[in-house]
Amino acid sequence: MRNRSKLLFLSSCAVPQQIKFCNALQKYFEAEFWFYESPENNKIRGKFWLTDFGNYCKILKPVLFFKSGFLSHKYWAFSLIKELKIFNPDIVMLGGFSIPSNIIAYRWAKKNGKKTIVFTERSRNQHGVLRGGGAIWRLLHWFYRDVDMVMVTAEDVVKQFRDEFRFGEAVVVSRHAADIDAYLKHPLRGKKPAYTYLFANRMTETYNPIGALEIFAQVLSRYPNSRLLMNAAGELAERCKEKIKELKLEDSVEFLTNINSWDELHKVYARSDILIFPAYFSNGNWTILEAMASGMGIVVSDRVLGMDQIIEDETNCFKCEPKTEEFLSQIERYVKNPQLFKIHANLNRIKVKPFSMEETAKDFAAITIKKLNLNS
């Protein structure tokens, strides 16, 4: 007789954090994670995102990806029902509400007496504005009217799904797992003649890489020999290269093109001193958690959502509007008072530890077992 429930998670794109999280969950569940898309097909990721899927994760094939129209960026997995019947999970967890194959998997689960979870971030439009309970969400609520649990990724998302979308007491809070064990071993930063800055996020409009370059140009003008390391992926790559030439930063900016594997990524953070993230919008971000674990100084936009519980302005980081002068002012607080690196790092490593694979798996299991009455 099995002691562990069989858990299936259906997710969009395979990422190393989720693959490692699936491994961590084996202590509590017979877990498998199935993905609609591989990073090699997803052009927004670097090649180093490709990793060993191990024994518990796989890419579903064949999958139809809708590139435009009403179902833009949605997936249909042709073999899904067959695969579900073979694995026969006790719990079906879905990464999001609106993917067509997720809806099919959900109805299969309900028809066959399975427990159901939807794991979700906040729902927003393309401008980062939170959605209300309009026609689409009324329809989705009808589809998922009998869901057992809606697991959101941050405290500030609860109200939207509990009240606006009317899922009520089904809503609980958990979090994304972060692959931070190697980062926690990095040495503390201290006083240097010049510092290395990191823009770790993709070069996409909402993350404002052009703004990061303008901020760094001001830093470099005041502190020669400063360096900026930049994520090499994203649709704004050419515009960023043009901006680098315009600002004459060619000798001071390094694109991160030589990361050979996921397990090498932490070395980029070890080389860096201060994370700069002047985003116009973000739902919360792994890069901030990684920088916290690494012991870096952190200067981020006040438009980053979902992280108020762990990053607090002037306590363990600095937050400001995504404007050049404001970012420069906050960066200089680290430069002029290097003791802040140690103070913030010591606080951040305590705050970020619960996001590790092991701790997140433990928390997820406790919430799920209690909410779904798996011990009864």
State the predicted function of each range.
Residues 100, 114-133, 146-149:
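A short, histidine- and acid-enriched strand-loop-helix "catalytic/donor-clamping" loop
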Residues 156, 177:
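Carbohydrate-associated surface elements
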Residues 189-220, 229:
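Conserved donor-binding/catalytic core segment of Leloir-type glycosyltransferases
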Residues 241-259:
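Nucleotide-activated donor-binding/catalytic signature segment of Leloir-type glycosyltransferases, i.e.
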Residues 267-272, 291:
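Short alpha-helical donor nucleotide-sugar binding micro-motif in glycosyltransferases
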Residues 280-281:
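Aromatic "clamp/platform" in nucleotide-sugar-dependent glycosyltransferases that forms part
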Residues 297-301:
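Short hydrophobic beta-strand element within catalytic cores of glycosyltransferases
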Residues 313-325, 333-338:
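Conserved acidic donor-binding segment of nucleotide-sugar-dependent glycosyltransferases
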